[in-house]
Amino acid sequence: MTHAIADSRVPALLDFLSSSPTPWHATASMAQRLEQAGYRRLSETSSWQLAPGERAYVTRNDSSLIAFQLPKGDTSLSSLRMIGAHTDSPCLRLKPNPAQASQGWLTLGVETYGGVLLSTWFDRDLGLAGRVQVRHADGRRETLLLTVMRPFACVPSLAIHLDRDVNSGRAINAQTQMSAVVMQLGEEAGTPAEAFNTLLIELIEEQHGVRVADVVDFELGLYDLQPAAQSGLKGELITSARLDNLLSCFVGLEALLEADGSQGALFVTTDHEEVGSASACGAQGPFLADVLKRINHYVGLDSEEGYQCLVQRSLMISCDNAHAVHPNFADKHDAGHGPKLN
């Protein structure tokens, strides 16, 4: 007999999934959790002073994070147990100049980020989230997180009587068929770009309670407002957007926080996995190596050879998900080697 997932951490997982619509939100949430647990924030642009038993974390681009706990005692660090995950998920990102006018409506052009399952984005209540850089009246610039947690836009389907072949495997063109519909344009709205800029400023001011002179730049995307849930008749399943790979982020962070400090432990989450990881804050970038070298400098064998020894003696588990056998598509897996749910 199957039963509901009884782990007491499920509510925290559901909250993390629902409140982390972008890599920047996920990283901010994990950083807050670490600080609540007593971890010290480090800066890559400042000198570090590390000692045995240290618990600290550092971020890069506000979308990648490394947290570590050094072993207690006076012995030098010889190895680390590491877990790696990624903060990004496939989604629809706004184009740099997204505003368009179509048949009297303000629509926003989108670009696919990662391997997006396009059909699932139609006819949903979509919020808007990401980060924006604003300029204040005094000329000061500031980067802020933006989270619009109400139906901001939708990508409407075409009525079936205008597209009788829609259920016959029609290809979806994200460039021409998936612009997000936001609002009707009145004569007072100005150009589409002006209307969107005004709307964006209003949303920022509403959330942060500040006066904004202008929006300098943004990295924004749409997200499904349906919250994460424990589902199935007996509660056996967790359904949510961004399970790939925020589930692994949550599990990795929990594992680090539960470490007893007897051995070195490290947790790394990187951005841009869905688009190849080839960035300064991606897994192919130098972020992890940079941090390991600095750790080795203070509590390891402070040499290139010592760093190589640390790497070779350590173990990393790379965590990802969304690979389990689908009950309706079991033929997509090797019958003897399909990963099972639960």
Q: What label would you give each PLM region?
A:
Residues 1-342:
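N-terminal hydrophobic/helix-forming segments and targeting peptides
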